[in-house]
Amino acid sequence: MPRLRPRVRIPSSAHGDVAEWLRSGLQNRLHEFDSRRRLKEMIAITGSGEFLPGIKNADKSLFSTIDNPYVLTFSTAAGKESIERQEYWKNLAVNHFKSLGLRHKHIEAKNKNEIDDKHVIDEMSKANIVYFSGGNPQHLINSISTKNFMNELIRIKKIGILAGCSAGAMIMGEKMIKGTGLNFIKNSIIIPHYGESYYSWISNTVKLLNKGKYKLICLEKDTYFTIT
């Protein structure tokens, strides 16, 4: 049975309580994806590469841990981008999950009003996997912060998988570079695209770490950091 172990990079800037927290805390909660293991709850986040060939095998293993998976994808974080970019994210997600043979629907909700639409909430009530793709994390969290949507998101968190890439990963932490996250991973700041770019994000985050309680989780491309 194929297995894939997600990787976590502990950056050189992570020392003292930061490195120890990663090594002895969440690090110990990582596990090998195994299709024989049935999960009730998981958060899975990656730095970049959502819906692309490089992450296909990881997604196949990841989503096989849920019985009767029904995936909803949201490109809401890119809701302020062009129509062409919206279509790009939609087509990428649709083709990706079709190739995996999974039941899937892409939700075209660009903002808070569209997120709170009845058809979106109805689909959320049927799903057990939600995947947020990349874009602007502040726009994403502002858009999904409605009572009806959050009630369903928390329900899915308890019975299935919440997945996110880039901006979709950043919102899972307690603090973001700008603003606050959902606090599903407490005492954390999540940095995507680690080793690619955005080094100013990392340096700014380290400054925050030196002032307070927030821990740094750096995410690479095509790997998942998972919490169960």
Regions found by a protein language model. Give the residues of each.
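C-terminal and late-domain segments of enzyme folds
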Residues: 42-67, 77-88, 96, 176, ...
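N-terminal, intrinsically disordered charge-dense segments
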Residues: 1-4, 16-26
